[in-house]
């Protein structure tokens, strides 16, 4: 009764109005699962391949009909007849069917859509929540949210090199309260921006994208919003950055060229100077996490940054690790970073995603489950965060339904878990000496 009888994919739109995949999986019993695939704007060069059509006459070349056809004509034929509960076998079968190291033949977007839909169908068959199916009986930790309330870099037109300025409500007693802290700070920030005559339009991830005078102006404004909402920076709420440094790293000159986003007169820094600058910010402000502070291929820079700040601040590898156990294993071996960002579409299956999270935990690295800038209403990452007890989630600001969908799912999960639910706040940063 749990045997897969049909697999069907269609082209739908993501939060940026670009095509993506939606996949449905059906079983003999009538159990059903649906998965939708996100898409990134700033992507690591080592990520699994997102298959696009390249036909400029249709969606500007971004169509996903090839990936849809690969699901309907190739993957479906291969996995119909499998037990929907055998996630690993199905994921491994798709990886083997693709046969490339980066899923470039069938497309990681095609494979991931099926992987998510299979898990959801299995949970539906067993009549249990997705987080329970994925994580078993020990699922209880609600993640500390990293809320991206200021968008810069490739996520907005704001003249700031850093891609994300985040708040982390670590002092809240529950996830529900953490969400309230964040929402109140978000609205306080909007009032401050309006009072300064700055833009309050939002970027791809729901954060504001005002024309600040620079990074420190952005941080100071966020601190003012935290206080205006009645909270204490460095106690109730900390700050985090996603530098997305690969987006402004000049490979030829081997420098971090802030002029790409901030214009003429902005800084151009060597690796050593980039580390000095990040340390200066950490010493000045209540910063607890920095993502992609160095370029994805600047291994020496990453090791030096970790040596300098790795005991004080969470140093998250996103483009650096691309949710890949090979890169993560090297990072662990060489002492580079102390945390990994987990994006399901960077690697392409739930099985490989869970392997990366497990490897990180075993090495004492934290794992931050993350959205992409091009999202959908699919809330699977909320269930993954709880299923793995990851302790942290990054899923955007306090606006845009594609972001709020994940927060609302976490509220439901917290309610369902009842007294068992744990919100660890600062304790989620077990890689730091605090």
Swiss-Prot record:
Q: Which InterPro entries does this chain map to?
A: Enolase (IPR000941), Enolase-like_C_sf (IPR036849), Enolase-like_N (IPR029017), Enolase_C (IPR020810), Enolase_CS (IPR020809), Enolase_N (IPR020811)
**Chain location of the short sequence motif Plasminogen-binding peptide per the record:** 248-256
Could you tell me which pathway this protein works in?
Carbohydrate degradation; glycolysis; pyruvate from D-glyceraldehyde 3-phosphate: step 4/5
Which residues bind (2R)-2-phosphoglycerate per the record? 163, 343, 372-373, 394
The entry's active site is: 205, 343
Transmembrane ranges, per UniProt, are none
Q: Which reaction does it catalyse?
A: (2R)-2-phosphoglycerate = phosphoenolpyruvate + H2O
The record's subcellular locations are: Cytoplasm; Secreted; Cell surface; Secreted, Capsule
Q: Which residues bind Mg(2+)?
A: 242, 291, 318
Cofactor notes: Binds a second Mg(2+) ion via substrate during catalysis.
Enzyme class, spelled out: lyase
Q: Per UniProt, what is one Pfam family of this protein?
A: Enolase_N
Q: What is its EC number?
A: 4.2.1.11
Obligatory cofactor(s): Mg(2+)
Gene Ontology terms for molecular function: magnesium ion binding; phosphopyruvate hydratase activity
Query: In a knockout, what does one observe?
Result: Essential, it cannot be deleted.
Instruction: State the PANTHER family in the record.
Output: ENOLASE
The subunit field of the Swiss-Prot or TrEMBL record says: Homooctamer formed by a tetramer of dimers. Forms a ring-shaped structure.
What the entry lists under HAMAP family is as follows: Enolase (MF_00318)
Purpose: Catalyzes the reversible conversion of 2-phosphoglycerate (2-PG) into phosphoenolpyruvate (PEP). It is essential for the degradation of carbohydrates via glycolysis. 'Moonlights' as a plasminogen receptor. Binds host (human) plasminogen when expressed at the bacterial cell surface, potentially allowing the bacterium to acquire surface-associated proteolytic activity, which in turn contributes to the degradation of the extracellular matrix and transmigration of the bacteria. Also binds plasmin, about 10-fold less well than plasminogen. A short internal peptide (FYDKERKVYD, residues 248-257) partially inhibits plasminogen binding to unencapsulated strain R6x.
Please identify the protein, giving its name as recorded.
Enolase
Q: Which organism is it from?
A: Streptococcus pneumoniae serotype 4 (strain ATCC BAA-334 / TIGR4)
